[in-house]
Amino acid sequence: MSEKRLQKREEISDEYKWKLEDMYETDELWEAECEKASQLAEKLSGFKGHLADSAATLLDFFKKQDELSYYLERIVVYANERSHQDTAVSKYQAYVSKAETLTVQASGALAFASPEILQIDDKRLESFYSESNELMHYKRAIDEIMRQKEHTLSAAEENILAQCGEMAAAPENIFSMFNNADIKFPYITDVEGNKIRITHGNFIDFLSSKDRSLRKQVFRGVYDSYKKWSNTVSMMYISKLKNDTFYARVRKYDSARAMYLSGGDIPESVYDNLIETVHAHLPALHRYMSLRKKLLGVEHLHMYDLFAPIVDNVQTTYTYDEAKKLVAKALEPMGDEYVSILKSGMESGWIDVYENENKRSGAYSWGAYGTHPYVLLNYADNLDSVFTLAHEMGHAMHTYYSNEHQSITYAGYLIFVAEVASTCNESLLMHYMLEHCEDENERKYLMTHFLDGFRTTLFRQAQFAEFEHIAHRKMQKGEPVTKDVLNELWHELNVQYYGPDMRVDDEISYEWMRIPHFYTPYYVYQYSTGYSAAVAFSKKILEEGKPAVDKYIGNFLCGGCSKNPIELLRSAGVDMSTPKPVDDALNVFEDYLKQFEAATK
């Protein structure tokens, strides 16, 4: 049995590590800022009962709240990123815990604010605005509070709910510990005779193997493991459904979906439009499954065949330096300024590039106001890693532009638009690579990568969205929600989405149990809507050039949360209140599918 040893962090060159010192030069400075934040939270609680006193008092409160947000963002990001670079360091585990405690303290200290602001009558507020031009800066923030008027409870009740926060997080925290630490998958023997334990990290790699018996072995190994724990995992999720139903009821929302979508001021019709439009295009996904079956040369297509390669990859490795150049070249349609900032970020401590022992898996972009964004990668010299770099730098550039052009009050863009900039970059990269590849086989390989991007993001996340909405509706109506009900629902959705050429294996009924996003309700649909908006923007940028780029950067990337997400996207040229962007994106999928069908005849 051979095993490649992961590098220790100190063995990796500093040029491939992020510079967290740009936030705090020393840990002592972080600790000092924690103390400042704690004291400021106490000061803010002293405003209780006085927000309606005068325009000056209300303004002072909002300014101090912004100051607290500034500290807390930095405190939380630094603690987590220090911990993520080496999760075995107990000092930084303690920092994460301290940051969480501070956040809860701040939440409790501010619990009085929204109910109190809601008690200020409209005439008095208008007189405050007349007295203070500075207070006008906070009008949108105040309007957002007023929008939640009928769903905000008394100060005492809000304080109780704030203190329930850690208890309410129990289903997610229990699932996270179970899924990341406790569940163990079996060992398998790979094609070279190595005995390897299946993990979350290598699961998809194994499912991407050309060896069908290995894929089947891994598939069954993972889902049989969840089956053993299925009663327990089901109860975790059912508890989450009960939580959501409780909070929706006490806050006087019609449903959990209405509650979660109200945070971003997203009409529920956007959710319904997505699922209905995806349903209308499912025949195209069924065609893709039929083509996959043909190209794999199998009598029956199974769920463990979804990631199997159907075209040989021509170039299997892309070094990190090659990836940086490729991404920068592909994003040239975004203009000189964008590319210049992008290149600078890739060279000046924004990115933690390579995997090391105990480093957090996956990839993300995260930053705090007042410092540059940070990107965590586990770069692996493959095509997926190149696209991940483009994706995460899309997030980072969005953060950079929003922070540069908005105050801290309105810099943080909302989840609904969070995946747009990242996926737009991926779309531009794919376009560039398809335009510049000369090898027909490489072109086919890239097309499968693009088509699978639609399958795993637009279609699959819509399937997730449909599952969690039906589950929440059942809970709200008082219908029985059990392990068997959830398993059957997930199985039926797989039959519907993948079509007649797919043999939907029994084991797939347990797949929903391994999806962490279900503990962040009504989140995943935004991957599908974001993907659709991104495809629309990339098309405009390539076809219209500078005018489209100027609107995209000036109105969207620089916009933060200065408008609600639908208005923000509309002002940049894409209207997500209609089914059109989703329909247009799925038409692009069908266009590429036709090209791929023709190329593989």
How should these model regions be labeled?
Residues 388, 399-423:
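Post-HEXXH active-site segment of zinc metalloproteases
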Residues 295-333, 339, 374, 398, ...:
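Long, K/E/R/D-enriched contiguous segments that form extended
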Residues 329-340, 366, 395, 399-407, ...:
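Conserved helix-loop functional segments at active or binding sites
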Residues 11-12, 25, 113, 117-120, ...:
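C-terminal, non-catalytic "cap/extension" segments appended to globular domains
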Residues 313-318, 351-371:
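Catalytic zinc-binding patch centered on the HExxH motif and its immediate surroundings
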Residues 1-313, 599-601:
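A well-structured
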Residues 374-378, 405-415, 444-453, 472-474:
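Short beta-alpha connecting loops at secondary-structure transitions
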Residues 316-318, 370-390:
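Short pre-active-site segment immediately N-terminal to the catalytic Zn-binding motif
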